[in-house]
């Protein structure tokens, strides 16, 4: 439940108590929870070469909160491709860091899991010992990669698609403007509060 709902609440450490298969299941549940069951289902239908029914299009319309059926299948394809691109970039950048401490295959799996977890804002990790990313707190590359995945994943697919189509802020939809403004404000306020209340050196 925690994985699908991407709440990050766990009673046991994922790395210490789950096998590779168990970790893969958790990663899959996180991905499904982040994308949405409907988007994943439509993606599987498209991968099988079948047509999406009217009922399926209605479900996607409600799940993605769009106003029209026009371009619905293209929208789902864009969502899936966007997810693959962001998480793929996260895997490559994370691997550059994890490969310094783990064997290549293990580092690759950690990178894949970490990118899925970060982009979907799930809070899970497979580093063991409930350490999360504490051992890598001084790694600028990994921290920037993780923050980037979390922020872009939090913005949402529709906002990112809107930005890709309308490069100027004033041309964006009201929804995108509100999301971007709120995100920027929360990041700024959170940063200033941490600086003011915590013993940090930056």
Regions found by a protein language model. Give the residues of each.
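Membrane-proximal intracellular helices of multi-pass ion channels
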Residues: 1-202
């Amino acid at each position: 439940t925690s994985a699908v709902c991407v709440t990050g609440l766990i009673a046991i450490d994922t790395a210490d108590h789950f096998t590779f298969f168990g970790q893969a299941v958790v990663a899959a549940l996180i991905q499904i929870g982040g994308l949405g069951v409907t988007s994943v289902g439509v993606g599987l239908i498209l991968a099988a070469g079948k047509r999406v029914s009217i009922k399926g299009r209605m479900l996607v319309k409600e799940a993605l909160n769009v106003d029209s059926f026009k371009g619905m299948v293209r929208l789902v394809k864009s969502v899936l491709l966007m997810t693959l691109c962001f998480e793929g970039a996260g895997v490559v950048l994370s691997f550059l860091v994890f490969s310094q401490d783990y064997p290549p295959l293990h580092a690759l799996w950690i990178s894949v899991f970490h990118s899925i977890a970060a982009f979907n804002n799930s809070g899970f990790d497979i580093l063991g010992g409930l350490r999360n990313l504490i051992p890598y707190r001084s790694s600028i590359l990994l921290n920037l990669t993780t923050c980037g995945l979390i922020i872009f994943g939090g913005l949402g697919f529709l906002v990112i698609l809107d930005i890709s189509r309308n490069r100027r802020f004033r041309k964006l939809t009201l929804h995108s403007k509100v999301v971007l403004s709120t995100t920027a404000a929360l990041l700024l306020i959170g940063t200033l509060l941490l600086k003011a209340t915590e013993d940090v050196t930056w």
